[in-house]
């Protein structure tokens, strides 16, 4: 009980910021953040409408194998021998 928790320190820090920085600057900062979020949402909506108007129909071709990859045979067991062979 003798020490203060993190919540106590955060409240003290908020009070000190309001006293020294002033409430007007904080409200201006919050307004700037709100305008930034609105701008971000608007641009995301514009991007979605641009993608819809490209005429591709929303279909994306499945990717092919990457360059340098090796296709394995389904009967390969990983031991160096085909899975159907028996060892003498």
UniProtKB/Swiss-Prot annotation:
Gene3D superfamilies xrefs: 1.20.5.3310
* Keyword NADP belongs to the record: no
Query: What taxonomic lineage is listed for the species of origin?
Result: Bacteria, Pseudomonadati, Pseudomonadota, Alphaproteobacteria, Acetobacterales
- A molecular function GO annotation: protein transmembrane transporter activity
**Would you tell me the protein name for this molecule?**
Sec-independent protein translocase protein TatA
Can you tell me which family this protein belongs to?
Belongs to the TatA/E family.
Gene Ontology cellular-component terms for this entry are:
TAT protein transport complex
Record InterPro entries: TatA/B/E (IPR003369), TatA/E (IPR006312)
Q: Which parts of the chain span the membrane according to its record?
A: 4-24
Q: What is its main location?
A: membrane
Q: Name one Pfam family in it.
A: TatA_B_E
At the top level of its lineage, which domain of life is listed?
Answer: Bacteria
Query: Sorted alphabetically, which NCBIfam families does this protein's record hold?
Result: PRK00720.1 (NF001940), tatAE (TIGR01411)
Q: How does it assemble?
A: The Tat system comprises two distinct complexes: a TatABC complex, containing multiple copies of TatA, TatB and TatC subunits, and a separate TatA complex, containing only TatA subunits. Substrates initially bind to the TatABC complex, which probably triggers association of the separate TatA complex to form the active translocon.
Protein purpose: Part of the twin-arginine translocation (Tat) system that transports large folded proteins containing a characteristic twin-arginine motif in their signal peptide across membranes. TatA could form the protein-conducting channel of the Tat system.
What's a BP term from Gene Ontology annotated to this protein?
protein transport by the Tat complex
Where does the record say this protein resides?
Cell inner membrane
Topology in the lipid bilayer is annotated as: Single-pass membrane protein
From which source organism is this entry? Gluconacetobacter diazotrophicus (strain ATCC 49037 / DSM 5601 / CCUG 37298 / CIP 103539 / LMG 7603 / PAl5)
Q: Name the keywords, alphabetized.
A: Cell inner membrane, Cell membrane, Membrane, Protein transport, Translocation, Transmembrane, Transmembrane helix, Transport
- Asked if the record carries the keyword Transcription, the reply is no
Comp. bias intervals (Low complexity): 75-88
Instruction: Give the residue ranges for region: Disordered.
Output: 45-88
